[in-house]
C-alpha cells in the first residue's frame, strides 16, 4: 500500500508526515539518472540545443488516418448528446457506489505484495509548524514574550517511530557477529543531538505572585532555593556548545507561561505583526479593520511603537485574550537570532557571503537552532491506545482541558520532565540537562548515544544507593526526589521484575523520544495523575514520578525483555514450524545447547559460567567508530555493553565480584511442567515464567545464551536465517493501517495482562498477511533499547558559602580530567558574594557568547580554527 509523504510546509505535516518508498527520505528511494554509458549534456550543449531551430512536429496525414477519423465522426458524434452523456455519467456513478459501499474491490496496492517498510513513520521527527505571527522577531520586553501556542499534536499521538536502524546487512553482522564490515557509505552520517533545559526565573514578580497564590491554595511550603536564578542557564548552554561543536541540532528551552491579560499585555505584542493578526482574527472573509483601509495606514516599520486597545479591532482583542499567552523568557535571549536557516541569521550562508567572508568554522556552519516551548505546549495526554495505533475516541479534548486545569500552572520540575516527549520538533536522541549542569571537556556524540551501542547510561554503582520498588507514604510529599524515585520503581516493578534498581549519577541524562513515548503509553495513568502535582510537597496520588530515572531503568528492562522474547517466542516458539508453542523440538534444542547426552536425563540443575567477551576490549569500540566515520568517545569509560547480555546486579561492599560470573539453572523450577512432565506449553506462558515470575531463571538463561554466542555478538538468541512468520490477516471490517508502529513488545502497565504471542505482536507492527522475516524483526526490536553502562569523571557540589565556593572552583580548576559538573544552589550564607564568585568563574570558563545572546559580538565571539 503506497503511503504519501506530506510536505513539511503542509499544515498537517508537523506531527504526521511519513515517508513512502518514493520519498527521498526513504531508504528505498532511487533518484533517476542518465542512462548508463551516456553523459548528461553540458550547460553549453543545452544552450546550443535550445537555440537550434525546432523540427516540425506535425502528425502525418495519411489517407488511412483520414478515413479512420471520418468513420469515428460519422458513427459516434451523433450519439454524443446531452441525454446520452447524462445516462453514461449516472451509470458510472452507480457502478462506483456499488463497489465503494457494498461490494468493495481490493485496491491494486492490496493485490500487490504490501510491505511494512512503506507504512513505518520516518525515523526523523518532522519540524513543527510556525507559530502565528512573526516568531523570528525579538521580544518587545526581554522578560516576557507574547506568543500563540502551537496546537496539540494531531491524533493519534504519540505515534511510535523507528529508531535509527542499521541497514539490513549491517544489522545482521552487528547483532549476530558483534562486528560489521559496513563503512561510512552504508551507515550514513553521524547523528546530531538535541539538548533540553527546564528554566524558570524565580525573581519574576509575575511568576512569584502565581506561585504564592497556588502555594496558599494547595497549603504547601516549597523551598525558595528551588527557584533561585544565578545566571546558570546561559553558561550551561555555552558549555554544551563548546564541548560538542558541530554535533548539535536543536537546543530546547521549556519555559513557564501565563494567561494573556488584556489590555495590560497588549504592549508585549509587536506592532509590526498587527495587520497579519487582524487577518487571522477576522472571521468573515475580506473583513478589514478601518485602520487597514487606503488612506489611513500607520507605519508598521516602527518596532518600538506600542499596541493599544484603540489600535486593534474587537475581533483581534477577543482573539488575543482567548488564544494567546505570555511566556517567561531569559532577558539575555535575542529571539531574532535563534534559527540559522533564517537568511538574516549571522551564520546563514547568505549572511556570511554578504559579509565577504570566504569560509565558516565548522561549528558555525552546523550551528544549532534554539527553540522554546511553554508548559502549555507540552502538557498533553496521549490520544492513542496502548497498541500505539488506535486513536482514543470520546470527549478527548474536553478531558485534556480539564486535566490541564488541574496541572497548570506547575512549579514541579518532575511533572514538567514527564512531558519532554511532547516537545515540538524534538529529535530522537536527546541530552536532558538541568540549568546547573556543565560540560567541562570536549565530548563526542558517542559519549552520549550511537546507533551501534545505544544510549550511554551513567549509573551510580553504590549498593546502598539503589532505589526501592515500593511507594513509601512518608515520602509522597518529599521536597526532594526520593518519593519520585520510589514511585517510579514501584510502577516499573508492576510491569517488570520486582527488585532494587541502581540510582544514576547526577549528570546530564540521555533519553530517546521513542522510549519516552513508550513510557507515556505504558504508564499513562500514573504519569497523568503525577503531572497534576503542582508542587512536590503535595499529597496527591502516590507521589511524583522521577521520569528521567524511569526512562533509564525502562531501557534496561525493555532490552532484557526483548532478548528473552527473541529466544523464547521468536526462536524456540517457531523451531518446529508451529507458532507460539514449546514442544518436543524445543526440548531437544535446549538439551543440545547444554550438551546433554542420553545418560543426562536425570540432570536437574545446570551451572552456567560467563564466557569470555571481547565487546569492550581496548581499541575495538574506537575501531568500530572510525570504520563508520564517526567520532569515538572522548570523555567516557565504559563498564558494560548490552551486547553482552543484561547488566549484572550490584553487590554489597566486600562481596566477591566473581559471583556475578556464574549462576544456576534449576530446570524443573525454570521450565515447570514443560520439563517435569514433558507437556507442550504456549511460548507466551514460558516468556512470562522466565522473564517475570522467576526472573533469576531468565537472567541465567541470558548468561548461558551469551556464552553460547561466543566472544562477540548474540547469535544464539536469534531464529535461523530465512525464518518467516505470517502476520494475522485483516479482521473483518478493519482497513489497512495508515502507519505502523516499529517493532516493540506490549505496552501494558503490568506483565500479567501482556500478550507476548507472535500473533498479537505482529498484529500491530506488521501488515495483515505479511511474511515477516522474524530474525531481522528481532534485531530491529533490540536496536531500540541498546545501552552502555559507563562513568565519566564528574563532580557534584552544593555551594554553601563564599569560602566553600572558592574551594570548589579551585578544586575543579586543578583537575582537568573532570568532564561533567553539577552545581546546586544551596547557599546558606554570603549569598551575594557566592553569586558574584559563580558568575566570575562562569565567565572565565566560558567567555564566548552564543549567537542568540543579546551581547554577542560578531568579532570577539566567533569561532577560530
From Swiss-Prot:
Its EC number is 2.7.8.32. Glycans are attached at residues 201, 302. Residues 17-26, 40-60 have a biased composition (Low complexity). GO terms for biological process: carbohydrate phosphorylation; D-xylose metabolic process. Its cofactor is Mn(2+). Residues 1-10 have a biased composition (Polar residues). It catalyses: 3-alpha-D-mannopyranosyl-alpha-D-mannopyranose + UDP-alpha-D-xylose = 3-O-(6-O-alpha-D-xylosylphospho-alpha-D-mannopyranosyl)-alpha-D-mannopyranose + UMP + H(+). Residues 106-865 are lumenal. One of its GO terms (cellular component) is Golgi membrane. It is an enzyme of class 2 (transferase). It comes from the Eukaryota. It is a single-pass type I membrane protein. It is found in: Golgi apparatus membrane. Residues 1-84 are cytoplasmic. InterPro entries: Stealth, Stealth_CR3, Stealth_CR4. Xylosylphosphotransferase that is specific for UDP-xylose as a donor and mannose as an acceptor to form a xylose-alpha-1-phosphate-6-mannose linkage. Functions in the O-glycosylation of proteins en route through the secretory pathway. PANTHER family: N-ACETYLGLUCOSAMINE-1-PHOSPHOTRANSFERASE SUBUNITS ALPHA_BETA, PTHR24045. This is 3-O-alpha-D-mannopyranosyl-alpha-D-mannopyranose xylosylphosphotransferase.
Amino acid at each position: 500500500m503506497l503511503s504519501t509523504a506530506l510536505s513539511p510546509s503542509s499544515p498537517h505535516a508537523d506531527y504526521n508526515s511519513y515517508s513512502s518508498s518514493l520519498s527521498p527520505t526513504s531508504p528505498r528511494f532511487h533518484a533517476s539518472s542518465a542512462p548508463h554509458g551516456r553523459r548528461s549534456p553540458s550547460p553549453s550543449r543545452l544552450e546550443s540545443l535550445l537555440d537550434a531551430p525546432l523540427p516540425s512536429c506535425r502528425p502525418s496525414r495519411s489517407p488511412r488516418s483520414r478515413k479512420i477519423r471520418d468513420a469515428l465522426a460519422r458513427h459516434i458524434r451523433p450519439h454524443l448528446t446531452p441525454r446520452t452523456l447524462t445516462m453514461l455519467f449516472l451509470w458510472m456513478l452507480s457502478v462506483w457506489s456499488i463497489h465503494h459501499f457494498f461490494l468493495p474491490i481490493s485496491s491494486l496496492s492490496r493485490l500487490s505484495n504490501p510491505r511494512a517498510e512503506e507504512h513505518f513513520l520516518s525515523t526523523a521527527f518532522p519540524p513543527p509548524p510556525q507559530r502565528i505571527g512573526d516568531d523570528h522577531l525579538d521580544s518587545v520586553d526581554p522578560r516576557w514574550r507574547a506568543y500563540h501556542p502551537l496546537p496539540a499534536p494531531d491524533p493519534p499521538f504519540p505515534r511510535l517511530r523507528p529508531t535509527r536502524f542499521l541497514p539490513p546487512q549491517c544489522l545482521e553482522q552487528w547483532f549476530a557477529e558483534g562486528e560489521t564490515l559496513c563503512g561510512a557509505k552504508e551507515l550514513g552520517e553521524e547523528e546530531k543531538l538535541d539538548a533540553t533545559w527546564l528554566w524558570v526565573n524565580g525573581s519574576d514578580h509575575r511568576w512569584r505572585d502565581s506561585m504564592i497564590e497556588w502555594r496558599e491554595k494547595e497549603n504547601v511550603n516549597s523551598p525558595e532555593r528551588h527557584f533561585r536564578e544565578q545566571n546558570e542557564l546561559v553558561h550551561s548552554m555555552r558549555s554544551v556548545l563548546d564541548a560538542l561543536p558541530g554535533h548539535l541540532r536543536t537546543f530546547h528551552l521549556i519555559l513557564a507561561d501565563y494567561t494573556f491579560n488584556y489590555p495590560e499585555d497588549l504592549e508585549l505584542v509587536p506592532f509590526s505583526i498587527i495587520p497579519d493578526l487582524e487577518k487571522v482574527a477576522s472571521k468573515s472573509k475580506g473583513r478589514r479593520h478601518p485602520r487597514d483601509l487606503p488612506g489611513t495606514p500607520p507605519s508598521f516599520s516602527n518596532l518600538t511603537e506600542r499596541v493599544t486597545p484603540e489600535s486593534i479591532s474587537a475581533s483581534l482583542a477577543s482573539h488575543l485574550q482567548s488564544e494567546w499567552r505570555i511566556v517567561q523568557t531569559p532577558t539575555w535571549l535575542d529571539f531574532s537570532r535563534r534559527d540559522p536557516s533564517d537568511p538574516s541569521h549571522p551564520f546563514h550562508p547568505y549572511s556570511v557571503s554578504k559579509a565577504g567572508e570566504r569560509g565558516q568554522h565548522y561549528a558555525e556552519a552546523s550551528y544549532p537552532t534554539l527553540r522554546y516551548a511553554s508548559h502549555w505546549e507540552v502538557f498533553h495526554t496521549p490520544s492513542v491506545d496502548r497498541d500505539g495505533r488506535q486513536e482514543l475516541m470520546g470527549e478527548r479534548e474536553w478531558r485534556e482541558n480539564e486535566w490541564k486545569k488541574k496541572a497548570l500552572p506547575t512549579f514541579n520540575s518532575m511533572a514538567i520532565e514527564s512531558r519532554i516527549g511532547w516537545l515540538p520538533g524534538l529529535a530522537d536522541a536527546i541530552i536532558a540537562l538541568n540549568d546547573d549542569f556543565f560540560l567541562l571537556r570536549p565530548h563526542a556524540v558517542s559519549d552520549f548515544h550511537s546507533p551501534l551501542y545505544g544510549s550511554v547510561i551513567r549509573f551510580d554503582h553504590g549498593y546502598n544507593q539503589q532505589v526501592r520498588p515500593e511507594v513509601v507514604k512518608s515520602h509522597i510529599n518529599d521536597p526532594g526526589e526520593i518519593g519520585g524515585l520510589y514511585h517510579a520503581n514501584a510502577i516499573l516493578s508492576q510491569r517488570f521484575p520486582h527488585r532494587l534498581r541502581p540510582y544514576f549519577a547526577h549528570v546530564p541524562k540521555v533519553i530517546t523520544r521513542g522510549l519516552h513515548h513508550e513510557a507515556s503509553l505504558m504508564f499513562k495513568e500514573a504519569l497523568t495523575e503525577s503531572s497534576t502535582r503542582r508542587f512536590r510537597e503535595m499529597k496527591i496520588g502516590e507521589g511524583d514520578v522521577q521520569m528521567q530515572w524511569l526512562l533509564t531503568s525502562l531501557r534496561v528492562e525493555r532490552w532484557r525483555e526483548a532478548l528473552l522474547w527473541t529466544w523464547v517466542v521468536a526462536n524456540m516458539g517457531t523451531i518446529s514450524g508451529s507458532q507460539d508453542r514449546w514442544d518436543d523440538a524445543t526440548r531437544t534444542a535446549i538439551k543440545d545447547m547444554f550438551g546433554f547426552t542420553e545418560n543426562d536425563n536425570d540432570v536437574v540443575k545446570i551451572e552456567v559460567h560467563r564466557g569470555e567477551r571481547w565487546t569492550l576490549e581496548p581499541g575495538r569500540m574506537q575501531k568500530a567508530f572510525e570504520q563508520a566515520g564517526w567520532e569515538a568517545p572522548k570523555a567516557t569509560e565504559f563498564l558494560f555493553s548490552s551486547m553482552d547480555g543484561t547488566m549484572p546486579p550490584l553487590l554489597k561492599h566486600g562481596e566477591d565480584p566473581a559471583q556475578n560470573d556464574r549462576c544456576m539453572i534449576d530446570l524443573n523450577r525454570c521450565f515447570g511442567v514443560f520439563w517435569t512432565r514433558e507437556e507442550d506449553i504456549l511460548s507466551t506462558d514460558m516468556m512470562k515464567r522466565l522473564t517475570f515470575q522467576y526472573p533469576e531463571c531468565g537472567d541465567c538463561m541470558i548468561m548461558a545464551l551469551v556464552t553460547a554466542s561466543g566472544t562477540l555478538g548474540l547469535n544464539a538468541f536469534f531464529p535461523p536465517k530465512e525464518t518467516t512468520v505470517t502476520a494475522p490477516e485483516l479482521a473483518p471490517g478493519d482497513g489497512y493501517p495508515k502507519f505502523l508502529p516499529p517493532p516493540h513488545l506490549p505496552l501494558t502497565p503490568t506483565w500479567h495482562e501482556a500478550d507476548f504471542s507472535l500473533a498479537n505482536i505482529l498484529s500491530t507492527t506488521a501488515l495483515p498477511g505479511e511474511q515477516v522475516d522474524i530474525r531481522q524483526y528481532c534485531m530491529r526490536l533490540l536496536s531500540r533499547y541498546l545501552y552502555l553502562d559507563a562513568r565519566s569523571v564528574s563532580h557534584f557540589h552544593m555551594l554553601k558559602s563564599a569560602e566553600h565556593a572558592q574551594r570548589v572552583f579551585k578544586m575543579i580548576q586543578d583537575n582537568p580530567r573532570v568532564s561533567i559538573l553539577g552545581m546546586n544552589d544551596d547557599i546558606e550564607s554570603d549569598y551575594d558574594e557566592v553569586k558574584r564568585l559563580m558568575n566570575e568563574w562562569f565567565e572565565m570558563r566560558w567567555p564566548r557568547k552564543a549567537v542568540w545572546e543579546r551581547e554577542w559580538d560578531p568579532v570577539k565571539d566567533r569561532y577560530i580554527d
